[in-house]
C-alpha cells in the first residue's frame, strides 16, 4: 500500500494537472484513508468503507486525468468506463459487473509485469542458453563455439542474425460469442478448449534481438507462480482497485422525464450492489468490491447529482466541483506540467532537427484564443489547446524533413497569422477548431 501523505499526493498531481485543488485534495484523502485502514485491527478494518467521489465539471478540465494519475501513483489497478455503455440486466449489452471483470484482467497484467521483473535475471540466463542452442551449428568443438557465440551475443554483434523459433499460435475468442455482454462466456469456452486440446505451435523466423525478448518472456512466464499471481492480483483489486465511471450524468434524468428512462434507472440500480459491496464472479474466482474506490464524473449540464436515484447518491458521499478553465489556466497548462503540450511538440520536431521556441506572448495568444473559442462554441476545456496547436504547427510538421537545422519562433504574430481568419468567422471556428 502506498504510503504517500495527502500533501505529497497533491504535489505529484500538480506536476500534471493545473488547478482543481478541491478535487486533488479529496482524492488524496481517499487514497490516504486506504493506507490508514490497513493500519487498523482486523475487525474494525473490514467495517471502514471507501468514501466514493462524484466529480462535477465540464469536459476537458481534468476529471479523468486526476483519477488516471492517481492510479499510476499508487500502482493500483485502474479502469475507466463510460456509464452509457452498460445496459440493465436482461437487455442486450454489457452488464455493470463486467467492469469488475475487466479490472481484474488489468490487475493480472499489472502484477504479471511486476512478478516477471522479479524473475527477469533468472529468465535471461535461461533464455540465453536457449538462444545459443538455436544459433549453435552442429559439429565439433561445440563448447568452444558456444562460448564464442555467447561473447558475440553479449556484445550485440548477433542482433541482426535470424533464427528459427517455435512460437505458440495466438487463438482468437470464439467469434460467434463476440457480441456485447457475451465476452465472459467466450473467454471461458476458449480456456476450456485450450485445456482439452494441445496448443499449436509453428516455426517462425526472427531476428536474434526479437527472439531474445520472446524467449525471456516465455521463461518469465514459466518461472512466475500463476496461483500466487492470481492471489496477488485479486488482493490488489479488492484493496486498491479504482473504477472511474465517466458520464454518470447521462444516467440521471430530471423528474419530469424519469418515466421514459426506465433503462437508465435500471443501470443505476444494477450499480448499487457493486458500489455498496458485493461479490462478482470472474474466471479468477469471486472478487469482493467492498473496498474498491469508485470515482464517478459528469458535466451535469442537463441534470444534477440529485437527479440520480437516492440510493446511488448515498453511495457517493463526496462531491468535488471542478472549475471551468480560462486563459490563465491554459497558459499554465502550456508552461508548467512536466508533459506540457509545448514540450511534446518541441521533442517531436527535434527528432527532425527542427527547433521550436515558444515565446511568452505567443503562448498567451494561444491561451486567449482557446478561451474565446470555448466561449463562442462548445466548451471542451483544455482539449481545445490540442486543436489550436495542431492548426498553427501543421505547416512545419509537414515540412520538417526538409527544414533540418532550422529554428521556428512561435510568437504572437505567428499565432495570429494562422488564426485571424478563424477568429473573424465564428461559423468557421465551429468546424475547424
Swiss-Prot record:
Coiled coil: none annotated. Disulfide bonds: none annotated. ATP binds at residues 18, 60-65, 246, 311, 383. The keyword Nucleotide-binding applies. One of its GO terms (cellular component) is HslUV protease complex. One of its GO terms (molecular function) is peptidase activity. SUPFAM superfamilies: P-loop containing nucleoside triphosphate hydrolases. One of its GO terms (biological process) is protein unfolding. Transmembrane segments: none annotated. It holds the Pfam family AAA_2. Keywords: ATP-binding, Chaperone, Cytoplasm, Nucleotide-binding. Belongs to the ClpX chaperone family. HslU subfamily. ATPase subunit of a proteasome-like degradation complex; this subunit has chaperone activity. The binding of ATP and its subsequent hydrolysis by HslU are essential for unfolding of protein substrates subsequently hydrolyzed by HslV. HslU recognizes the N-terminal part of its protein substrates and unfolds these before they are guided to HslV for hydrolysis. A double ring-shaped homohexamer of HslV is capped on each side by a ring-shaped HslU homohexamer. The assembly of the HslU/HslV complex is dependent on binding of ATP. This is ATP-dependent protease ATPase subunit HslU. The gene is hslU.
